[in-house]
């Protein structure tokens, strides 16, 4: 069965974006992207690079982890604001929204249904694992369905912002088993956790 992986960049203090929710790596962002970080993404997670980054870096690798990406409307709108109607044309791309009524790109599937039932259906289908891109609200809604966490921890703190999970996650303590870790010279750490068995 396919797994749902929340693969996300986070600060040391657990935030995925600043208080306004804008792209922390964008033109006015606060998140530095060192060369070794980019090299690690290219070699280990090429499918998670958006199309403009893949083109700029001449990345053609299919990737071995994911063939489907899920994101909420607010995360999707960050790409739209940058002129990307489908930042991941190399993946099946689902956007969860109750307010968007028409997809700006025929390759992007809009889903107004319950995210939990949709993910349970996706897990039963053949294919590679499912990448939960974010944001925090969708991650909060899917908290109980997440099988793997891959945290790209940047060596910075911001004090306030959007946390890994929104208030939509219920209080439900879970333990996770460290499966892998990579420490980059720039100070970023990639941590892979699997949900511990009950």
Which ranges hold each PLM region?
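Enzymes that bind and transform nitrogen-containing heteroaromatic metabolites
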Residues: 1-198
